[in-house]
């Protein structure tokens, strides 16, 4: 994926960059795999804001992605097109199966139009093929990994993401996550070979607030510049630091939102490193 920069004809143009979409082979999606997608604007059924900074954005239709691929074991599929998906950072690939069915999958890096893919325990170790973890060699780079057998891919689905299969211990496979966390997963879970494509998406500079509004993202305002009626950090004469430990607009201490003692935490072998401890 190449990134295009523009001449600075306007302030927004000066800062922004866009993808050249060189991998995209078709601009119109498969109509049979589209579903309507309604917007909530961050509100619940009562009309109350439950998630701030959401609203507006361009109209979208949801592309139905096959995250399981377990009912197509042994059926060859041809990559008909690589397409853009507005609902995720990764591109998607349209597969035409030998039995006539069409399905979308996450497009891995290096997948070409016309390639033949397969899923199942006997599939080759080839980019785009889907296999159980017990049939994948140690050290292989994978993505779209299940947390529970048959539950569908949950991990490593965004652009550029990948997981490394470190080893197998009895009925578990040991995985290194993109966050550097090392986790055990049931060896019956399935994964797709390769890493997710469109890795340069992280380097795109949006350049102006308007492009974020097209994505449905509204402005984020700091509490210290609000009035006291709007935020605990608001008010004061001149610029202030808030005068207390950081809190939410409802007075809850900032941070520590991760749920402790989740059932899946017992599968973690080593916690992820903090940013300051990560190897550069």
UniProtKB/Swiss-Prot annotation:
GO terms for cellular component: large ribosomal subunit. Residues 1-59, 223-280 are annotated as: Disordered. It comes from the Bacteria. InterPro entries: NA-bd_OB-fold, Rib_uL2_dom2, Ribosomal_uL2, Ribosomal_uL2_bac/org-type, Ribosomal_uL2_C, Ribosomal_uL2_CS, Ribosomal_uL2_dom3, Ribosomal_uL2_RNA-bd_dom. Residues 45-59, 269-280 have a biased composition (Basic residues). Keywords: Ribonucleoprotein, Ribosomal protein, RNA-binding, rRNA-binding. Part of the 50S ribosomal subunit. Forms a bridge to the 30S subunit in the 70S ribosome. Belongs to the universal ribosomal protein uL2 family. HAMAP family: Ribosomal_uL2_B. One of the primary rRNA binding proteins. Required for association of the 30S and 50S subunits to form the 70S ribosome, for tRNA binding and peptide bond formation. It has been suggested to have peptidyltransferase activity; this is somewhat controversial. Makes several contacts with the 16S rRNA in the 70S ribosome. This is Large ribosomal subunit protein uL2. It comes from Corynebacterium jeikeium (strain K411). The lineage of its organism: Bacteria, Bacillati, Actinomycetota, Actinomycetes, Mycobacteriales.
């Amino acid at each position: 994926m190449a990134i295009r920069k523009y001449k600075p004809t306007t302030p927004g143009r000066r800062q922004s960059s866009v993808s050249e979409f060189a991998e995209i082979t078709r601009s119109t999606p498969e109509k049979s795999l589209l579903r309507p997608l309604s917007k909530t604007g961050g509100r619940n059924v009562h009309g109350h804001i439950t998630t701030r900074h959401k609203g507006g954005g361009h109209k979208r239709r949801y592309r139905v992605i096959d995250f399981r691929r377990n009912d197509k074991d042994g059926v060859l599929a041809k990559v008909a097109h690589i397409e853009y998906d507005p609902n995720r950072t990764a591109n998607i690939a349209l597969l035409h199966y030998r039995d006539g069915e069409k399905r979308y999958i996450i497009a891995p890096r290096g997948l070409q139009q016309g390639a033949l893919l397969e899923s199942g325990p006997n599939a080759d170790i080839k980019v785009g093929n889907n296999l159980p973890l017990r049939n994948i060699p140690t050290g292989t780079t994978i993505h779209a990994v299940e947390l529970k057998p048959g539950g569908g891919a949950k991990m490593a689905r965004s652009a550029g993401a990948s997981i490394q299969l470190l080893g197998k211990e009895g009925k578990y496979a040991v995985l290194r996550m993109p966050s550097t966390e090392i986790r055990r997963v049931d060896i019956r879970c399935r994964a797709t070979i390769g890493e997710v494509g469109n890795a340069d998406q992280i380097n795109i500079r949006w350049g102006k607030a308007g492009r974020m509004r097209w994505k449905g993202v509204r402005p984020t305002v700091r509490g210290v510049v609000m009035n006291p009626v709007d935020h605990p950090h608001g008010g004061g004469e001149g610029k202030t630091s808030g005068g207390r430990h950081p809190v939410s607009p409802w007075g809850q201490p900032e941070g520590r939102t991760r749920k402790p003692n989740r059932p899946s935490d017992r599968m973690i072998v080593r916690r992820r490193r903090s940013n300051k401890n990560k190897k550069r």
